[in-house]
From Swiss-Prot:
Keywords: Ribonucleoprotein, Ribosomal protein, RNA-binding, rRNA-binding. The lineage of its organism: Bacteria, Pseudomonadati, Thermodesulfobacteriota, Desulfuromonadia, Geobacterales. GO terms for cellular component: large ribosomal subunit. PROSITE patterns: RIBOSOMAL_L10 (PS01109). This is Large ribosomal subunit protein uL10. The keyword Nucleotide-binding does not apply. It comes from the Bacteria. The gene is rplJ. The keyword Ribonucleoprotein applies. Disulfide bonds: none annotated. Part of the ribosomal stalk of the 50S ribosomal subunit. The N-terminus interacts with L11 and the large rRNA to form the base of the stalk. The C-terminus forms an elongated spine to which L12 dimers bind in a sequential fashion forming a multimeric L10(L12)X complex.
Length: 174
C-alpha cells in the first residue's frame, strides 16, 4: 500500500473509531480463513465491523480519539472489532468465539467509554443481558407500581358491588 493509501486508511479508521461506542482487540494468530470468515459473519449480524489493520496505522488512527487507551495493546497480530451500537452484543460474539475455538484466538483488550478494559472485563460485559432485555426489565419494574395502583382502584368498586349484592341477597332471603 502506498503512502497516500495509508493516509486515506488512517483517516477512515480514525472516523470509525470516533463514531464507535466500543472497540475490542484480539490476537488472531492461528486462525484459518474459514474461522475468520465465520467470526466476521457472526460479528456482522451483531452490527460489528471486524478488520485486521497494521498496528502502526491503528495507533495513528486512534490519536485524538477516546480510543487512545488501546495504544499499549497494539503489538503482535491485531484484529479490531468496532461496535457502533451495542457493545454487549460484540462482547458476546467475541467471547463465545474465543471459548469455542481450539486455536489460540484471544481477546487482548477493549475500550468502552474512553477507558481500557481487560479481557476479564470483556467477559463480564458479555455475561450481561442484551440491551433489549435490560430495557424490558427496567420498564417492567417502572410499570409494576402503576399496575398495582390500578388493581387497588379496581378493587374498591368491586368490593362495594359485592357488599351491595350481599345486602340484596340477605334482604331477598327475609
Amino acid at each position: 500500500m502506498n503512502k497516500e493509501g495509508k493516509h486515506q486508511l488512517v483517516a477512515e479508521v480514525h472516523d470509525k473509531l470516533q463514531r464507535a461506542k466500543a472497540v475490542f482487540l484480539a490476537d488472531f494468530r492461528g486462525m484459518n480463513v474459514g474461522q475468520a470468515t465465520d467470526l466476521r459473519n457472526e460479528l456482522r449480524k451483531a452490527d460489528v465491523e471486524y478488520k485486521v489493520i497494521k498496528n502502526t496505522l491503528l495507533e495513528l488512527a486512534s490519536k485524538g480519539t477516546d480510543k487512545e487507551a488501546l495504544n499499549p495493546y497494539f503489538a503482535g497480530p491485531t484484529a479490531v472489532a468496532i461496535s457502533y451500537d451495542d457493545p454487549v452484543a460484540a462482547a458476546k460474539v467475541l467471547s463465545r468465539f474465543a471459548k469455542e475455538q481450539t486455536n489460540p484466538f484471544t481477546l487482548k483488550a477493549g475500550v468502552l467509554s474512553g477507558k481500557a478494559i481487560s479481557p476479564a472485563d470483556i467477559q463480564a460485559l458479555a455475561d450481561l443481558p442484551s440491551r433489549e432485555v435490560l430495557i424490558a426489565k427496567m420498564l417492567g419494574s417502572m410499570q409494576a407500581p402503576a399496575t398495582n395502583f390500578v388493581g387497588v382502584l379496581a378493587a374498591v368498586p368491586g368490593s362495594f358491588v359485592r357488599a351491595l349484592n350481599a345486602i340484596r341477597i340477605k334482604k331477598e332471603g327475609n
